[in-house]
Amino acid sequence: YVVPAAKLEAIYPKGLRVSI
């Protein structure tokens, strides 16, 4: 499923980027 970038930022404060 696709998660909003903001949500990912919240989960990964280090700035992890997931390729979509």
Swiss-Prot record:
UniProt GO BP: innate immune response
Localization in the cell: Secreted
CC per GO annotation: extracellular region
Chief location category: secreted
Signal sequence, start to end: none
Keyword Secreted in annotation: yes
UniProtKB keywords: Immunity, Innate immunity, Secreted
Assembly mode: Monomer.
Family assignment from sequence similarity: Belongs to the insect beta-1,3-glucan binding protein family.
Biological role: Involved in the recognition of invading microorganisms causing their aggregation. Activates the phenoloxidase cascade. Binds specifically to beta-1,3-glucan. Binds the A.niger cell wall component alpha-1,3-glucan, a fungal pathogen-associated molecular pattern (PAMP) that activates the host immune response.
UniProt protein name: Beta-1,3-glucan-binding protein 2
